From Swiss-Prot:
SUPFAM superfamilies: Blood coagulation inhibitor (disintegrin), Metalloproteases ('zincins'), catalytic domain. Its main location: membrane. Subject to proteolytic processing during epididymal transit of spermatozoa. PANTHER family: ADAM A DISINTEGRIN AND METALLOPROTEASE DOMAIN, DISINTEGRIN AND METALLOPROTEINASE DOMAIN-CONTAINING PROTEIN 5. Residues 388-476 form the Disintegrin domain. Pfam families: ADAM_CR (PF08516), Disintegrin (PF00200), Pep_M12B_propep (PF01562), Reprolysin (PF01421). This is a non catalytic metalloprotease-like protein. May play a role in sperm-egg fusion. This is Disintegrin and metalloproteinase domain-containing protein 5. The lineage of its organism: Eukaryota, Metazoa, Chordata, Craniata, Vertebrata. Interacts with TEX101. Gene3D superfamilies: Collagenase (Catalytic Domain), Disintegrin domain. Residues 17-142 form a propeptide.
């Protein structure tokens, strides 16, 4: 009975999500099994035994990599302050594959927090997800349907006015000769979730993030036949409020989003996922313009009651039309009953595939310049490897409740089992800088990471998490050393400090003449990586120090060259080793530099610092649109590495408004003052309005009194004048009456 109750509650939770029309509810406990692929390559393959409708099915999976190593998710807190978090933890969670014994089947799953995704057979799709209220890896499976969802077509007969077949090359005019074999290509994408969709999906950032990644996973599974993969560059969730004005007209919404996109996400394709209960169309974009920066934006509308599977088809169709593809005609055929580029694909369950028409069109389009933005290789992509859980390494990893270190060196013996990395008894936490020896999370404002430099900030326990908050430090390019140097990656970078670190406390950075002497040589003792340093980059190549001693430099594995420049004995260094054949300057890549090169961030001119052996202006590396110390920090703080204000003592974050005893930032973990749910910025705005009203009252009240006095005075004068005028008129009338009587008498007399 208790199990049934939990399942009922879970079903109600599902109904609050993306698709209330779920049928054939059943439970299963997926069993992880071995297979030849798993035995050969366990890093990239998985296999599960999953029971559906009382029939066991063998599921074979292969890793699906589409989250870039640098991908981030942006969210907003209750003060509307933006926070960013890397998506690297989810990079190796996505898989796709097939059901053994069913040639026309497709499986798309995420596996890091239970199995979530779609199992597609020929005519039916099943969704699977864990029952979080039950232990034992219990999952629920249900058939995906859209019986009551109102799904409009994405076509020219809808309100979607951007779609016009005249904008396209018709298939009949396409040259379909000389096609080459398709090669793997990639599309970099930024994804934005609007506030209404965030609320519709549950108002939980983690849940919404999971669903967005599932959607892109489904899209990539369908795109595999085109050898195309969408890479997630960023996901932004408008959890507080929408950043643009939303319009009922999807065309207007696209224009508004395009303007926002070009200001904040200008480098890649951007999609806005928005909720509309009963939309007139499924989205809008600029057809055939995927690779044009001014037009590579799209809006996908999520109708009420739609499944994630169906919405992924909408996104896929929009993406296809953006590439220049069109809807299938009755002459187009595919391996399954439903082709992807048809309206029917949105509300149909089961496997869907591209038609031969679409494949031919894509092969043709991929040879043209219109799709030049499709990359042959993902930029700076590292080999994706599934993280191995190592209990006892002191790092909290997937499926671990705690990790206090080895059995010998466990930091929280009373709280965490070092063999299983599970919490003991009733422990709240079992490892981390903010976990006490009593197995509870430490209070707010306890220091968990000290500052190591004037550019580095102190971090505090936030009272919620057992681990210290991420490191915060001054933004790159912030002044330090009384304005004589710059902060870079949390350190005040100076040549003096670097020379002392290399050769001892009495050694200092050399003069410009010494740098120019050595770094113009273009050899192993003086260079800017590839060759000699250009004049403007002289201070950014090899580190040159002044040597104050008469004896030679004696340091293991270090070769030194000397030069007497005026009054200074200058030294340049080279770490021993074989010089590569490809270069005479020891290195061919700035990323490979050693400590004998000038550190990035070292000053090289007015408002300029060294970066990758070049002297560059700091303003190019400080995004003032996101954070400006004058505009955003009230001139009582500096911008940190997360683009938020770190306030001086006596000023309250996030906007550095004056408040006794306050300091720091919203990122350093300490408890800053918030009043009535409003930040001090909001409070100051309300105070400003109040002061403005008081000022208006103070000015207008005397003015009203003066005006009233004048009006009263004028009224009195008017009454006096009227009385005098009345008396004058009365006197005149009496005189006229006397004159009349005399005349009449006279008249009588004359008769």
């Amino acid at each position: 009975m208790f199990l049934l109750l939990l399942l009922f509650l879970h079903l109600k939770g599902l109904q609050a999500g993306q698709n209330p029309q779920k049928t054939t509810l059943q439970t299963t406990v997926p069993e992880k099994i071995s297979s030849p692929d798993v035995e050969t390559d366990a890093e990239d393959h998985m296999a599960y035994l999953i029971t559906i409708n009382e029939t066991p099915h063998f599921i074979h999976l292969k890793k699906q990599s589409f989250i870039t190593p640098t991908a981030v998710v942006y969210t907003y807190d209750r003060n509307d302050v933006q926070h960013s978090q890397p998506l690297s933890a989810l990079e190796n969670c996505n898989y796709n594959g097939y059901v053994a014994g069913f040639p026309n089947s497709i499986v798309t799953l995420t596996v890091c927090t239970g199995l979530r995704g779609i199992i597609q057979f020929e005519n039916v799709s099943y969704a699977i997800e864990p029952v979080e209220t039950l232990s034992g890896f219990v999952h629920v499976i249900y058939e995906n349907t859209n019986k009551h969802a109102v799904i409009p077509d994405l076509g020219k007969n809808q309100s979607y006015s951007w779609f016009d077949e005249s904008d396209y090359q018709f298939r009949s005019n396409m040259k379909k000769s000389g096609f080459t074999v398709l090669r793997q290509r990639f599309i970099m994408m930024d994804i934005i979730v609007d506030k209404k969709l965030f609320d519709y999906m549950g108002s939980d950032t983690e849940v919404v993030l999971q669903k967005v990644i599932q959607i892109i996973g489904f899209v990539n599974t369908m795109l595999s036949k085109l050898k195309l993969t969408v890479l997630i560059n960023s996901i932004e969730i408008w959890s507080k409020e929408n950043r643009i004005r939303l319009s009922k007209a999807v065309d207007d919404l696209l224009v508004q989003f395009s303007i926002w996109k070009h200001e904040y996400r200008s480098q890649h394709v951007a999609y806005l996922l928005a909720f509309e209960e009963h939309p007139a169309s499924t989205g809008a974009l600029y057809p055939g313009n995927l690779c044009k920066l001014e037009y590579n934006a799209a809006v996908a509308l999520y109708p009420k009651g739609l499944s994630l599977e169906s919405f992924s088809v909408i996104v896929l169709q929009l993406l296809s039309i953006g590439m220049g593809l069109t809807y299938d005609t009755e002459n187009c055929h595919c391996t399954g009953e439903v082709c992807l580029m048809t309206p029917k694909a949105i509300y149909s369950g089961g496997v869907k595939d591209f038609s031969t028409c679409t494949l031919d069109d894509f092969k043709y389009l991929s040879t043209r310049q219109d799709l030049r933005c499709l990359q042959d290789l993902p930029l700076e992509r590292k080999p994706a490897r599934r993280p191995r859980r190592i209990c006892g390494n002191g790092i909290l990893e997937m499926n671990e409740q705690c990790d206090c270190g080895t059995l010998k060196n466990c930091t929280h013996r009373k709280c965490c089992d070092p063999m299983s990395c599970r919490l003991k008894n009733k422990a709240t936490c079992g490892s981390g800088e903010c976990c006490s020896q009593d197995c509870t999370v430490k209070m707010n404002d306890v220091v968990c990471r000290k500052s190591v430099d004037e550019c580095d900030f102190v971090e505090y326990c936030n009272g919620k998490d057992p681990y210290c908050v991420p490191n915060t430090y001054a933004r790159n390019g912030q002044y330090c050393e009384s304005g004589e140097a710059f902060c870079f990656e949390g350190r005040c970078q100076t040549a003096d400090k670097q020379c002392m670190s290399m050769l001892g406390k009495y050694v200092r950075g050399a003069s410009f003449a010494c740098y120019e002497e050595f770094n113009s040589r273009g050899d192993r003792f003086g260079n800017c990586i590839h060759n000699f340093c250009a004049f403007r980059n002289s201070l950014c190549g090899k580190l040159i120090c002044t040597w104050p001693f008469k004896k030679l430099v004696l340091k293991a594995n270090l070769s030194v060259a000397y030069a007497q420049i005026r009054d200074d004995l200058c030294v340049a260094m080279y770490k021993g080793g074989r010089i590569p054949k490809t270069t005479k300057t020891t290195y061919s890549n700035p990323a490979d530099r050693d400590e004998t090169f000038v550190n990035d961030g070292t000053i090289c001119g007015p408002d300029m610092f060294c970066l990758r052996a070049s002297c560059t202006e700091t303003r190019f590396h400080m995004d003032s649109s996101k954070c400006d110390s004058t505009r955003d920090c009230n001139d009582h703080g500096v911008c940190n590495n997360l683009q938020h204000c770190h306030c001086d003592i006596g000023y309250n974050p996030p906007f550095c408004e004056e408040h006794k005893g306050q300091f720091g930032s919203v990122d350093d973990g300490h408890k800053y003052h918030v009043e009535d749910g409003k930040s001090y910025k909001q409070q100051s705005h309300s105070n400003l309005k109040k002061n403005q009203l008081q000022l208006i009252l103070y000015i207008s009240l005397p003015l009203l009194v003066m005006i009233s006095a004048v009006v009263i005075k004028q009224s009195k004068l008017s009454r006096v004048c009227d009385r005098e005028r009345s008396e004058s008129d009365s006197s005149t009338t009496e005189d006229s009456g006397s004159n009349t009587n005399v005349t009449s008498s006279g008249g009588s007399t004359s008769h």
